[in-house]
Swiss-Prot record:
It comes from the Eukaryota. It comes from Rattus norvegicus (Rat). Keywords: Cytoplasm, Cytoskeleton, Golgi apparatus, Kelch repeat, Repeat, Translation regulation, Ubl conjugation pathway. Substrate-specific adapter of a BCR (BTB-CUL3-RBX1) E3 ubiquitin ligase complex that acts as a regulator of neural crest specification. The BCR(KBTBD8) complex acts by mediating monoubiquitination of NOLC1 and TCOF1: monoubiquitination promotes the formation of a NOLC1-TCOF1 complex that acts as a platform to connect RNA polymerase I with enzymes responsible for ribosomal processing and modification, leading to remodel the translational program of differentiating cells in favor of neural crest specification. One of its GO terms (cellular component) is Golgi apparatus. This is Kelch repeat and BTB domain-containing protein 8. The gene is Kbtbd8.
Length: 575
């Protein structure tokens, strides 16, 4: 059987369609636009047309048929799909094409449109997509858009489209354990906002909505006492509808269980050789969890936790089977972590493969900055910078840095990006796509650590030009364009420390991996301790506030730390 036979026939049919050869039906759509095509092709792809041409009705013998409610662009896309199996989707055409595919009963096009809309969900369009999916009864599109709304609930409720939900649609969103709210009061406030949009029509629904959606035991008594009498009466009715169980214990919403944790990437489990693991430390409770490791065992990835608490990784390399290989092949992978399922979701690849790039969120977009590759004559640092627009779901090249950088740091403050490495200190303005130079740090060094804290950029530790490791601390006042030396981090070089800087619970912290060598009965023994130090900016000193449990994992020299709010019930508990 020739596998290319069907493709060849389809190609020839497309040629005849383009040239108007042997066409036997003219389809007229809105605004009088006509398309000459082949009945057999239309009937083969669409039960709607098959029924039209074989039913014996008037249309089956006509040489021209008129279809009302179909746009010309959508009809053209359907025909292109019929003759090529390909369809080009955009935000402007996807819903109209879905509607046309629904009329013509072509589920394969509907599914492609649904997949496109799912991949382009954002706080601005998610409600509209959910309403659209509910209207057409598309299960997957409805479920996925509803999941997104629950995940981004606080952002979504600010949108005007939230007010267009029907009563049943609103209940289907709010009556869920997976709602990402840290306080039940947010749910109540969203209902009141929805109600106030059309008070006369919606007041009758309040008791039912309160009964099904509000978990009053999770609300503060002081808040309940301040509820206006008008709504209090509806609450009393709701309690009557739901019965005594309404005042008993309630399951917490997903967002209420979130705990800020320190995530360690590029760690190896103690009992699995060099197999990577991603431990998550809940400092407050002392619990340790494990995050799903990056796909393909990626190492030295760029890491970012967005303001919306989304975790992204980009670039990196896959470990070589050879123990001696150091020229790793750079990857262009881009992944987003799904909190509820504890897995990584594939996103559009970087335009440029890169190891050790820095990811920064600025002005609503994500930037991948610098890094290194092993190409041509060996190891090369990168100047290139690219930007990810979640609305367009794609990366685009922006102005490159004036100097190539690896082992650098990048932070954001007030819609500007700051990049530091050695004697170079750069700033980038996304609105102008412009890079400029700033006053370099007083002790130039690479492989240091940077974070923004109280309108200053703190730069800590690093390696000087003579390859000497230092634990210098400097703070750059962004408004004054001035560096200030702080007290060095007190650290004993003999313990071979490796440091990572994080902003945890709104304070600067250093996560320190220390190696201790002891001699017992003429046998050298190596042990490692991982500790957390908190910075007191008033006293200008560091205090140990936590020590991790021993022997859970091994942090190598290239480990990285990030801070995010995680959901314990979605993670694997280690300790």
């Amino acid at each position: 059987m020739d596998p290319f036979h069907a493709c060849s026939i389809l190609k020839q049919l497309k040629t005849m369609y383009d040239e108007g050869q042997l066409t036997d039906i003219v389809v007229e759509v809105d605004h009088g636009k006509t398309f000459s095509c082949h009945r057999n092709v239309l009937a083969a792809i669409s039960p709607y047309f098959r029924s039209m041409f074989t039913s014996g009705l008037t249309e089956s013998t006509q040489k021209e048929v008129r279809i009302i409610g179909v746009e010309a662009e959508s009809m053209g896309l359907v025909l292109n799909y019929a003759y090529t199996s390909r369809v080009i989707l955009t935000e402007a055409n996807v819903q109209a094409l879905f509607t046309t595919a629904s009329i013509f009963q072509i589920p394969s096009i509907q599914d492609q449109c649904a997949k496109y809309m799912i991949s382009h969900l954002d706080p601005q369009n998610s409600i509209g997509v959910f309403i659209f999916a509910d209207h057409y009864g598309h299960q997957e599109l409805g479920d996925r858009s509803k999941e997104y709304i629950r995940k981004k609930f606080l952002c979504v409720t600010k949108e005007q489209e939230f007010l267009q939900l029907t009563k049943d649609q609103l209940i289907s969103i709010l009556d869920s354990d997976d709602l990402n709210v840290d306080r039940e009061e947010h749910v109540y406030e969203s209902i009141i906002r929805w109600f106030e949009h059309e008070q006369n029509e919606r007041e009758v629904h309040l008791p039912e909505i309160f009964a099904k959606c509000i978990r009053f035991p999770l609300m503060e008594d002081a808040f309940i006492e301040k509820i206006p009498p008008r709504f209090a009466q509806a609450i009393v009715k709701s309690c009557g509808e739901k019965g005594p169980s309404n005042t008993n214990g309630c399951t917490q919403r997903l967002g209420m269980t979130a705990s800020e944790m320190i995530i360690c990437f590029d760690a190896a489990h103690k009992h699995s050789g060099k197999k990577q693991t991603v431990p998550c430390l809940d400092i407050v409770t002392g619990r340790v969890f494990k995050l799903c490791k990056p796909p393909n065992d990626l190492r030295e990835v760029g890491i970012l936790v967005s303001p919306d608490n989304d975790i992204y990784i980009a670039g990196g390399y896959r470990p070589s089977s050879s123990e001696v290989s150091i020229d790793h092949k750079a990857e262009n992978d881009f992944w987003m972590y799904d909190h509820s399922t504890n897995r990584w979701l594939s996103k559009p690849s970087l335009l440029r493969a890169r190891i050790g790039c820095k990811l920064v969120y600025c002005c609503g977009k994500m930037y991948a900055i610098g890094g290194r590759v092993y190409e041509g004559d060996g190891r090369n640092s990168l100047k290139s910078v690219e930007c990810y627009d979640s609305r367009e779901n794609c990366w685009m090249t922006v102005c490159a840095m004036p100097v190539a950088m690896e082992f650098h740091n990048a932070v954001e403050h007030k819609e500007k990006i700051y990049v530091l490495q050695g004697e170079f200190f750069l700033f980038y303005e996304p609105q102008k796509d412009y890079w400029g130079f700033l006053t370099p740090m007083t002790v130039p060094r690479i492989q240091g650590l940077a974070a923004v804290y109280k309108d200053s950029i703190y730069y800590i530790a690093g390696t000087c030009g003579n390859h000497q490791r230092v634990f210098t601390v400097e703070a750059y006042d962004i408004e004054l364009n001035k560096w200030t030396r702080k007290k060095d981090f007190p650290c004993d070089q003999s313990i071979n420390p490796y440091l990572k800087l994080v902003l945890f619970q709104n304070k600067l912290h250093l996560f320190v991996r220390a190696t201790q060598v002891t001699v017992e009965e003429h046998i050298f023994r190596t042990s490692r301790k991982n500790s957390l130090y908190q910075y007191d900016d008033i006293a200008d000193q560091w205090m140990k506030v936590y020590e991790t449990p021993d022997r859970l994992w091994d942090l190598g020299r290239h480990f990285e730390c990030a801070v995010a709010k995680l959901y314990p019930q979605c993670l694997q508990k280690v300790l």
